[in-house]
UniProtKB/Swiss-Prot annotation:
GO terms for molecular function: rRNA binding; structural constituent of ribosome. Belongs to the bacterial ribosomal protein bL31 family. Type A subfamily. The keyword Transferase does not apply. This is Large ribosomal subunit protein bL31. Binds the 23S rRNA. Part of the 50S ribosomal subunit. It comes from Chlorobium chlorochromatii (strain CaD3).
Amino acid sequence: MKQDIHPKYNEVTVVCANCGNSFVTRSTRPSIKVDICNNCHPFYTGKQSIVDTAGRVERFNKRFAKKAQA
């Protein structure tokens, strides 16, 4: 095997731009900045909003029923 062909693998700190959370991991990059992390992502925090599709389905069924009667 050839020696010294792989990039240097260092410990880096990942910083969230949104909430400021940081953690240490290993990477070939000198630093990592992420837009959103698990501390502030709506899916992980439970603040996820659910789209109301029931109203849309009812509206479609009303339109479809009108066209079926005609």
